[in-house]
Amino acid sequence: MAAAAAAASVASQAQAVLRGRLCDQAVVHSALRSSPDTNYSKLKYLVASSVSEACNNSVLLLGPRGCGKAAVRFSFLVYSSAPLSAVFSDAGVVFDEMCQWAIYDFTLWVVSAWTEVVDMVLDDLKKDHPDAISVIRLNGMLHSDDNCATKEIARQLCLEHQLSFSKMASSDDNTEFMIDMLRECGLAHKTIIFVLEEFDLFAQGKQRLLYSLLDAMQSLTSQAVVIGVSCRLDADQLLEKRVRSRFSHRKLLFVPSSVDSLQRLMEHLLALPEDSPLPTKYVREYNARITSIFNDKKFKGILSSLTDADATTSHILRFLFRVVSYMDIDSGLLSMQSFMNALSSMQRQPKMDSLQDLSILELYILVCMNRLEDKEKSSYNFITIMKEYKSVQDAYKTSDKYSHTVCFRAFEHLLDRELISFADNKGRNQALEYRPVKLLISSRELAESLKLNTTCPAVLQKLLDRERYM
């Protein structure tokens, strides 16, 4: 009994350590700081040189959502020096070392919603130049209106420099105040860094804010850096000629993480450090087990299934947190079953259940749509699907032939079940047959449903497998 209690105690301590690592952005993003080729290093060099050399600069961070444009941002700016318990107590959440699910959900909100590379850079620079940096943050979803944006800039500048803010000031007054502050901060050798989230939304309308800001930065007395963050790769092309001429045209492109890099991240996060308070023998045994799991072919399949739907860092963190929760308390070690259980708990079961109730014809329609997407058809509708269905019938000489009317009813049923949807809101006055549609399930989900469906014709499984492995 005593030995079992001791093992359970060690397992609980290990879970607490691992959860702490998953909740600590310094640990999550430490790999970014170690390599000189990362966007983090490039952005830090750019901003640091602007601060030290007292010059103006501008840069765009472009890439799809969830690929880390903003990690190279919040991780440390606000909460880096505070212990995790302090973060949650400030938010009105009681921190428990065993970490309840509700607390974890809040942690991930902090990790992903405040986002991630800019904050890391700003935190490092604030440590190096504590009195030489002032940060102003705007979001295009909230401040795309020029009047609202200049007012928010004035408010943040007043708050940063302990000045009184006038809510009644006009837009022109706020713009003039911003220009004056840029000049005064430049004379005081202090850099103002403007972080513009959803930058493409600022590049609409007359773009008066961007013009005023970039034009003021042309002055020798000003000292500022503009960092634009956008998921649109053509964000710089949206700028007017007068604005574009004042922009530096520096761009850092972010791409989604590869499967190999995600596996390295998982290995890094799940490995117990040698200097942890846990017994050395246990740490070595645990780390050896983790290495063995990651080298297993089954794990490759789990990772592939996980990243098919979502390959973002926040999704990986949610998965790993569940893996830790499925740790075997008796042995205190993770197993392949821990990863499989975590994956099962994250997969969208309602859609899988819906797929089990479909008719043979509806499965044919889904497989035909999947084939069209694999052929990289940019747009297709019911008529296109029927042509694909006919080509399948002609190629395989199957007996599963249905009339156009019956097929259309099955198509409407799939729309009602929300397994497929219209590609856009255009053409609402068009007949349903001609409106573009898209699949709302992945090829892996479709393949799993075909395997579980006992009435599914073998030809459908062949068709899907052929497309997946071509």
UniProtKB/Swiss-Prot annotation:
Pfam families with a match to the protein in the record: ORC4_C
UniProt GO MF annotations: ATP binding; DNA replication origin binding
Principal localisation: nucleus
GO biological process annotation, one example: DNA replication initiation
Subcellular localization: Nucleus
GO cellular component: nuclear origin of replication recognition complex
Tissues with expression: Expressed in the shoot apical meristem (SAM), leaves, ears and roots (including root tips).
Record-listed ATP binding positions: 63-70
Induction details: Reduced expression upon sucrose depletion-mediated cell proliferation arrest, and accumulates after sucrose treatment.
Disulfide bond sites: none
Keyword ATP-binding: yes
InterPro entries tied to this protein: ORC4 (IPR016527), ORC4_C (IPR032705), P-loop_NTPase (IPR027417)
Keywords recorded for this protein, A-Z: ATP-binding, DNA replication, DNA-binding, Nucleotide-binding, Nucleus
Function as written in the Swiss-Prot or TrEMBL entry: Component of the origin recognition complex (ORC) that binds origins of replication. DNA-binding is ATP-dependent. The specific DNA sequences that define origins of replication have not been identified yet. ORC is required to assemble the pre-replication complex necessary to initiate DNA replication.
Similarity comment text for this entry: Belongs to the ORC4 family.
Oligomer status and interactors: Component of the origin recognition complex (ORC) composed of at least ORC1, ORC2, ORC3, ORC4, ORC5 and ORC6. ORC is regulated in a cell-cycle and development dependent manner. It is sequentially assembled at the exit from anaphase of mitosis and disassembled as cells enter S phase.
Name the UniProt record assigns to this protein: Origin of replication complex subunit 4
Gene that encodes the chain: ORC4
